[in-house]
Amino acid sequence: MAFGAGAGGGRRPFFRRRKTCPFSGANAPKIDYKDVKLLSRYVSERGKIVPSRITAVSAKKQRELAQAIKRARFLGLLPYVIK
């Protein structure tokens, strides 16, 4: 079966807007393992660290963020797994 031009088969190219890192800038928040409210925004509902391609955090700040989350987990401020 042949599809005509009116079938809507053409796709527009996906335009991805580059987001800026929320931790870089003049009044950006500091990454601190004691700031549970900030860290919980970068942990999924299952307790996993959200990747930087979703959160738009730079590579350097993503490493700092992961270290802070792991520190908070070790001290019992954040859970390892959320059921």
UniProtKB/Swiss-Prot annotation:
UniProt xrefs under Gene3D superfamilies: Ribosomal protein S18
Q: Which GO terms describe its biological process?
A: translation
One short Pfam name that applies is Ribosomal_S18
InterPro entries for the chain: Ribosomal_bS18 (IPR001648), Ribosomal_bS18_CS (IPR018275), Ribosomal_bS18_sf (IPR036870)
Molecular-function GO term, any one: structural constituent of ribosome
The residue ranges crossing the membrane are none
Similarity comment: family membership? Belongs to the bacterial ribosomal protein bS18 family.
* Quaternary organization: Part of the 30S ribosomal subunit. Forms a tight heterodimer with protein bS6.
Q: What does this protein do?
A: Binds as a heterodimer with protein bS6 to the central domain of the 16S rRNA, where it helps stabilize the platform of the 30S subunit.
What protein is this chain from? Small ribosomal subunit protein bS18
The beginning of the lineage is: Bacteria, Pseudomonadati, Pseudomonadota, Alphaproteobacteria, Hyphomicrobiales
Query: What gene is behind this protein?
Result: rpsR
